[in-house]
């Protein structure tokens, strides 16, 4: 996914060609080192930021401070005219209203896995105050076409390259429902209304505490939330799909299988044809075993 973005940036094609400044958000040293290269290759400034992978109160405070500093730096460097708290509150309120339907779809497991994945990906780049009526119409139609799957599988996945829908495609082919977790799904949408006039730190803290993904270090808090969500959705199994360079969850696969009350498959993936074939075979075997046990 990083290489795909870099290719588009260097080729100056698509949305990356229109960027005036990058907010470089990284959880690991490998990505942080990329930012200097990105600035050198494109001539576009990069403001580096660090996203702690461990979810704790201290880390939330650190991240809130990072976002406050980022907003100040953007003003100092002439990229922003300043933070408009009222406008930020209105934007966030519109975003959460629109995201509510997607949250319900991600939680229910009744919207088709491929369609749900496409909607979540499109929504991540949508502007809720910019009249994205076509997208919101698609969300409403997806809700109205809710189906009754044979069973549901929860998916916690690192967002991959567009079109890499290995797990959603496999679930869809079997008529299985998908409960989409992670930062691109249910766990990427905070619940409840935002503050009416939030500061950058207010929103950063709220999102840091609410949003979990496969890059979040699996400490006791994350495990407890995962157990709670799996029980709440009635998922019959859990698939954790991470990239090979991001192995925090793969290292915890034994604890996952011990603590979760449902069967668990942990995929340690790459995007090569051989890697995709191996992951597809393991996923098929897991679903066969899961169906045999129901």
Regions found by a protein language model. Name each.
Residues 1-74, 82-83, 178-185, 189-294:
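Trp/Phe/Arg-rich N-terminal binding region typifying the photolyase-homology
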Residues 64, 68-192:
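A charged, amphipathic alpha-helical module
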